[in-house]
Amino acid sequence: MSIESLDWFVIFIYLFLLILLSAYLSKDQKDLKDYFIASRKQKSQNLAISMLATQCSTNSILGAPAFVAFTVGGGLGWLKYELAVPLSMIVIMIFIYPIFYRLKIISIYEYLEKRFDLKTRLLMSSLFLFVRVFATGVIVYGVSIVIELITGLSFIYSVLILGFITIIYDILGGIKAIIYSDIIQMVILTSVLIFILFYLTNILGGFQSMFDHFPEQRNISLNFVDHGLGDGNEFAFWPMLIGGFFLYLSYYGCDQSQMQKGLCAKNQNEGQKIFFLNGILRFPLVLLYCLIGVGIGAYSQINSDFITSLPKQDGIPNFNLAVPIFLIENLPIGVVGLTLVALFSAAMSSLDSVLNSLSAVTMEDFVKRNKILNYFSKKNNLFFSRLITFFWGVLAIILAFYVEDISNNVLIAINKIGSLINGPIIGVFSLGILTKKVNGNSACIGIICGFLCNLYCWVYLADVSWLWWNVIGFIITFKIAIIHSFFFSKSQTNKSYVWSFRFFKEMGFNNTWINRYIILFIWFIIIFCLIYFL
């Protein structure tokens, strides 16, 4: 398969303008605060869109429709996963974000050193670096197979083009380039997704006809009996709600790639608004690419040859390629190029943020501990940060060649990787924020036990939904640390690192914040009703 010259021209212009924008934004960079948190001068709306774009990767565009249309046990039930988002945002806005922003830190793991000790900080930083770069390799892999399919380029060239273009504009522009490019990419991506949905409904004879041809068993069924704890129902209601809650708490509240956007805000109130907007806007976006999955599923029912036309992986159709195959077969020249630009946009909006956060954590938690850097200028430190960004980008590219067999659905693959550590991560931050006597030794022992327990579930308890790993890891980490500290910890921490209502009021707590929490809870109820009656 190959694309026409006009499509290549569209792609080239987009990538060229992206690098040009990054070069322009780089001229104001003077130090690490400029490079990693944009000197804390960014508007909440821009940061909210950037955070949303980071979450909406190419793997979501590929994986969500594949899950809805084809995955065993899948269907529109994926929307149940979104119930947890508004609830998790409320908790993040009340308990987690205020403490991080008050400390004026770049790496969120610096909080763990202030609250516990150095080894806890380095352990969590290392865990983040290891898991996040591996998940980034999955992202690069997912979009590169699409580039290979549409353009006719080899997989190797597809990986290199995607990886190095992202590395170049990330190195040049830093977090500010990431924020503005994410906004552009989000506009392109949303526009293309809406176009694809309208195109599908048009060829299927309308919205109602699309649902009529969609297999009935793949519609949402809210079964409150199934629990996913050994009953084989991996995507039952309870693991998606409760497990999803802890997953999103960890991802949005205790993951550097997301929280770093919150640390770019002008003030505490603007930062609160970022998470509020994400809690509202994420569901419509997820609903959009799930509806595309409905359209693809309906299209495959009408066109029986469609599934057989999908490339095979171990003799099984690669359903992750269903959307791009449909686009290639149906869209005119030029529009295919725009579609590929949208896929590039989705991939880059995830990759750029992750690479910058990997660089920030490496620089702040490891490199800057070397006293020799005290003799270097701010410009030299900036150079080191860019060099570290390049290193992580190259490593992610290399890993992309080794992640093919993790899961048949790339979206599930990424969430499985994250779910191994999400529970322990939120567990250790909760210990810091909510308890006064737990020390670093207790926290580290809890983290290790939580991770090992999740690993045991993956290897030996296949019937337990991976969504429960987020809960199991949290409970084990929290309980073990509490028990250990009861016997071995006599110290009490600085109260400024532990949440209290008095502390919360000092952060600017007001009626606007209360209204946001109420709106998010109402939004949770609305989403539940939409899912129940859909």
Q: How should each PLM-predicted stretch be described?
A:
Residues 1-534:
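Membrane-embedded helix-loop-helix hairpins and adjacent transmembrane boundary segments
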